């Protein structure tokens, strides 16, 4: 669900409305990169029985370095929480006319209720709720394409990598931040560790025997899980951009979620616009646990401090409500929150590639040379993109 949060919606919708099909290639590339990265994260948790923050916490010996690393990881997790609350507030405003600040508070209360379901009723009850929300999200964001299909020539042309000024680079960074999501890298390694954890604490060397299932079999199943999840998420994210490119390009005011909603309502009817708003609301609620879970795991792994998920959620509501209360444009805040995520990706990705390449840590399951090369290329590309973005911003380009 991390790949279908309001940050994805804002980034893809704005990119399609402003640049048409220009950044289709970024969505596709981001999805391919996310597949590799999330599989490596899951593999690390399965093979070692530890999360990425745990492994880094044991390997970063200087306390100030460990705290600095924790701070940047905590900021990207908090940026995700901010996006969820703002997206839910905008959706409630579009659907029911609720003021943004009150909508943010309502979204926060509902997200806390969902976390209670997860903690008290177990993962299965929470997964049932999330699957239902996923169906709503997919329907809400793909319905418009049936009423106004995209231009096939434009879609194919959008697969050619290129930019058009600083704003397109900013949106590309936002799309990649929303797609790859560094906090999801931390969280997925922990989720895979917990999902396949044996009943009793076990040393890494004895995990396979304690589980009673071969590690290669678990890794094959994980590859399928990641493939299916990202195929669904990638399709929906691409649908959002194509919907905007086909219907909103050149229309005044459609570089905001509110403007996009109004244009969809005027051009395709109230049903499509309502489905869009419902999908936006569902995306904020469905991804509510990811940022809180990732932040808790980051703090425990790096600082060895445990904070209850609900307490974390209450704390992270503050910056989101402050943004809404100050009247900052919510779409701009959403897009910039995803840019923050893009700057956090290398800090999660580079250690992930290094650790999953080590024979002493993963043994026979370490990365193949081609996999490591792909991870290095992804890291270099993301660092270069962020460097170009900074240069354009500070040079006035």
Regions from the language model: what does each represent?
Residues 33-42, 64-84, 92-118, 177-178, ...:
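Helix-loop-helix module between adjacent transmembrane segments
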Residues 134-160, 169-190, 352-360, 385-396:
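Hydrophobic alpha-helical segments and their helix-loop junctions in multi-pass secondary transporters
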Residues 14-39, 53-58, 102-103:
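Extracellular loop-to-transmembrane helix junctions
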Residues 106-107, 118-144, 163, 340-341, ...:
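Membrane-interface loop-to-helix entry segments
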Residues 63-66, 101-104, 228, 271-273, ...:
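Loop-to-transmembrane helix boundary motifs in multi-pass membrane proteins
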Residues 11-16, 39-65, 117-122, 251-265, ...:
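Flexible loop linkers connecting adjacent transmembrane helices
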Residues 35-47, 192-207, 211, 231-259:
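Extracellular/periplasmic helix-exit of transmembrane alpha-helices
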Residues 68-74, 95-117, 135-140, 306-322, ...:
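Transmembrane alpha-helical segments of multi-pass small-molecule transport proteins
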């Amino acid at each position: 669900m991390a790949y279908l949060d309001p940050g994805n919606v804002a980034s893809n919708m704005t990119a399609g409305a402003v640049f048409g099909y220009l950044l289709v290639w970024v969505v596709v590339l981001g999805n391919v990169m996310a597949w590799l990265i999330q599989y490596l994260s899951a593999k690390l948790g399965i093979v070692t029985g530890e999360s990425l923050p745990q492994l880094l916490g044991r390997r970063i010996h200087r306390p100030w370095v460990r705290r600095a690393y924790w701070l940047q990881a905590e900021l990207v997790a908090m940026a995700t929480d901010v996006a969820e609350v703002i997206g839910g507030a905008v959706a409630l405003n579009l659907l029911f006319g609720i003021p943004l600040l009150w909508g943010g508070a309502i979204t926060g209360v509902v997200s806390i209720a969902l976390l209670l379901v997860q903690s008290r009723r177990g993962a299965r009850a929470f997964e049932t709720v999330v699957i239902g929300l996923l169906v709503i999200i997919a329907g809400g964001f793909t319905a418009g394409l049936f009423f106004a299909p995209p231009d096939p020539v434009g879609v194919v042309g959008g697969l050619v990598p290129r930019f058009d000024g600083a704003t397109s680079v900013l949106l590309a960074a936002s799309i990649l931040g929303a797609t790859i999501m560094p906090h999801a890298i931390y969280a997925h390694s922990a989720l895979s560790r917990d999902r396949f954890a044996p009943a009793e604490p076990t040393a890494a060397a004895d995990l396979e025997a304690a589980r009673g299932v071969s590690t290669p079999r678990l890794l094959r199943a994980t590859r399928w899980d990641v493939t299916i999840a990202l195929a669904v998420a990638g399709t929906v994210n691409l649908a959002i951009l194509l919907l905007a490119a086909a219907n909103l390009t050149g229309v005044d005011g459609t570089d905001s979620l509110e403007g996009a909603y109004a244009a969809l309502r005027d051009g395709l009817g109230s049903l499509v616009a309502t489905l869009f708003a419902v999908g936006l609301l569902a995306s904020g609620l469905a991804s509510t646990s990811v940022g809180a879970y990732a932040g808790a795991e980051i703090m425990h792994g790096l600082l060895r401090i445990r904070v209850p998920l609900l307490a974390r959620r209450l704390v992270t509501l503050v910056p989101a409500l402050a943004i809404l209360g100050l009247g900052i444009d919510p779409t701009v805040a959403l897009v910039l929150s995803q840019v923050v995520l893009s700057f956090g990706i290398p800090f999660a990705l580079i250690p992930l590639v290094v650790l999953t390449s080590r024979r002493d840590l993963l043994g026979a399951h370490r990365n193949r040379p081609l996999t490591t090369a792909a991870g290095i290329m992804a890291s270099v590309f993301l660092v270069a993109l962020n460097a170009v973005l900074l240069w354009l911003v500070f040079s006035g380009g």
